[in-house]
């Protein structure tokens, strides 16, 4: 379980997020959604230990601030937002960077782990290609394969591991969006946990168990089932007039936007 309690982050004297609190459970995919600039990425960086924070973040009962980098690397893998940074390395070299927390792996085992991670994101055969030659979507999948090298199993020594994914499908075509979200779903079903920043609410409703809505650096709604997606909430958080239907087969909510409205 990841417990976020009263978390605040200040950068350059400015409060970016304030009093964020929710719980994410192993075996579930928890989504964080909200408008641009609402504090989603900052929240993820606090949870992962990348940013100093006030309040408390506990993974499996351990305070993140008290864990050493190698301890964090053993229990959580982080996929940052897609970036335009160019790495002068091959795909194989980047993916195997995820193995730095397991340097004692036999070379054959390391190669097998990297190959399995690449296969899971549909990049078999890309091992020798240079990162900067790839499309944005391919680069995003390479970075996810690196994370899957680091966290190859959802449960280690009886304790769940976590994938912290910041917009994992933002650059992907629909086919690979479904591939990656299915992979995340399977990770949860095997005992691990996933927290993912998402923008597509319909894709989120299809794969996530719970959703946390943020606005202006604060929670707009607690981690809850998708009953929180009401017309009123969507208008308040996103400034959109919507109609929320349900998929007849299973009742999954489906958001249809009417029009944008002026924000206060």
UniProtKB/Swiss-Prot annotation:
GO cellular component, one term: plasma membrane
GO molecular function: ATP binding; ATP hydrolysis activity
Oligomeric and partner information: The complex is composed of two ATP-binding proteins (HmuV), two transmembrane proteins (HmuU) and a solute-binding protein (HmuT).
SMART domains: AAA
Protein keywords: ATP-binding, Cell inner membrane, Cell membrane, Membrane, Nucleotide-binding, Translocase, Transport
Main location class: membrane
Role description: Part of the ABC transporter complex HmuTUV involved in hemin import. Responsible for energy coupling to the transport system.
All copies of domain ABC transporter, residue ranges: 2-241
Protein family (similarity comment): Belongs to the ABC transporter superfamily. Heme (hemin) importer (TC 3.A.1.14.5) family.
Protein name according to UniProt: Hemin import ATP-binding protein HmuV
EC code: 7.6.2.-
One Pfam assignment: ABC_tran
Gene (name only): hmuV
Organism name: Rhizobium leguminosarum
Main enzyme class: translocase
UniProt xrefs under Gene3D superfamilies: P-loop containing nucleotide triphosphate hydrolases (3.40.50.300)
Topology class, membrane: Peripheral membrane protein
Annotated ATP binding sites: 34-41
Subcellular compartments: Cell inner membrane
């Amino acid at each position: 379980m990841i417990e976020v309690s009263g978390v605040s982050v200040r950068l350059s004297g400015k409060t970016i997020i304030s009093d964020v609190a929710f719980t994410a459970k192993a075996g579930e995919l928890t989504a964080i959604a909200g408008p641009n600039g609402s504090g989603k990425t900052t929240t993820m960086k606090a949870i992962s230990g990348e940013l100093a924070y006030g309040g408390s973040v506990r993974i499996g009962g351990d305070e993140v601030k008290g864990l050493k980098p190698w301890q964090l690397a053993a229990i959580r893998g982080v996929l940052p937002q897609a970036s335009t940074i160019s790495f002068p390395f091959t795909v194989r070299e980047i993916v195997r960077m995820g193995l730095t927390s397991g340097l004692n792996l036999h070379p054959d085992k390391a190669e097998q782990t990297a190959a399995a991670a690449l296969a899971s994101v549909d990049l078999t055969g890309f091992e020798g290609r240079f990162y900067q030659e790839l499309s944005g979507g391919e680069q995003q999948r390479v970075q996810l394969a690196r994370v899957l090298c680091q966290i190859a199993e959802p449960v280690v020594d009886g304790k769940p591991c976590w994938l912290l994914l910041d917009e994992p499908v933002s650059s992907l075509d629909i086919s690979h969006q479904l591939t990656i979200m299915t992979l995340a779903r399977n990770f949860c079903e095997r005992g691990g946990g996933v927290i993912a920043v998402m923008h597509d609410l319909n894709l989120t409703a299809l794969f996530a168990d719970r959703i946390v809505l943020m606005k202006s650096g604060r929670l707009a709604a607690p981690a809850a089932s998708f009953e929180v997606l009401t017309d009123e909430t969507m208008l308040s958080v996103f400034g959109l007039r919507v109609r929320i239907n349900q998929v007849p087969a299973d009742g999954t909510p489906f958001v249809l936007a009417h029009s944008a409205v002026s924000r206060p």
